[in-house]
Amino acid sequence: MEFAKDHGFRYVQDELNNVVIYKPGTPGYENSPTVIIQGHMDMVAVKDADCTLDLEKDGLLLEIDGDWVQAKGTSLGADDGIAVAYALAILAADDIPHPALEAVFTVGEEVGLTRGNGTGCL
């Protein structure tokens, strides 16, 4: 919510912790159809049976394999972070003409998007 507050955007957060941030269209695009950017914020941390990391407090052990970054013994955990980062970057930009934007950040994607339905936007 701090991001939305800091940028003066209207936002809603539902009881399931889904968030929608609204950014008005720029001049000339006010009457264009709204564009929704959606990403999920949650992740499921998975580790190999012999991995001793505590996924609640330890960092990941990363390794580079050619052009790939991999986590050793665990899921990488980035999951849909790129969608969240992309949406925040677009919202923060003040030099990109755009229609009204609704950035929808959901939780519970791994269980059939059941928790994302709480936004009232889906």
Residue ranges with predicted function:
Residues 29-100, 105, 110-111, 120:
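Active-site metal-coordination/substrate-binding segment of hydrolases
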Residues 1-33:
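A non-catalytic alpha/beta surface segment that caps or lines the substrate-entry region
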Residues 117:
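Functionally critical mobile loop/hinge segments
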